[in-house]
């Protein structure tokens, strides 16, 4: 059994894994994981992935996946910890933090083509792949297909 700190660390690490699942084009079981419960589609995907692939307790899944819908929680600190970590990791300034959940433009229809960015992408673009010494340097080549689908298959095999 994990401690609460360990559970919150897991929730914080996995809270946006749904963005990966969306881009990998996995199917969402809408009847069980509704966008309306979580406020954003990627959060519903996160809940499904954490339930299906990580077999996490539903309370832990909620700490993580409800990070955009705090008004529907009981106000416990655990929800706020993950939500605050999400905002801090995104580098939000205070005024952006206050308007974050109100901005519905965040998930437009073209989300699948929007590359997930990391700190290394600021200057150059890196291949979307597993971390490996053979692909740690940036590439000039552009992908001709959805690299997230390939990466998802590798993820499942691990």
Regions flagged by a language model, labelled:
Residues 1-152:
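Divalent metal-dependent catalytic cores for phosphoryl transfer on phosphate-bearing substrates
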């Amino acid at each position: 059994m994990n401690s609460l700190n360990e559970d919150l660390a897991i929730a914080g690490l996995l809270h946006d894994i749904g963005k990966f699942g969306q881009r990998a084009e996995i199917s969402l079981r809408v009847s069980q994981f509704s966008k309306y419960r979580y406020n954003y589609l990627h959060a519903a995907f996160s809940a499904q992935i954490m339930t299906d692939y990580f077999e996490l307790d539903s309370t832990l899944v909620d700490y993580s996946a409800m990070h955009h819908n705090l008004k529907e929680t009981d106000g416990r600190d655990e929800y706020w910890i993950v939500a605050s970590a999400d905002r801090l990791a995104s580098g939000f300034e205070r005024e952006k933090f206050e308007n974050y959940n109100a901005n519905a433009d965040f998930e437009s229809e073209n989300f699948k083509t929007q590359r997930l960015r990391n700190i290394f992408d600021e200057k150059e673009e890196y291949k979307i792949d597993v971390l490996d010494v053979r692909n740690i340097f940036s590439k000039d080549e552009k992908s001709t297909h959805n690299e997230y689908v390939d990466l998802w298959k590798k993820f499942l095999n691990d």
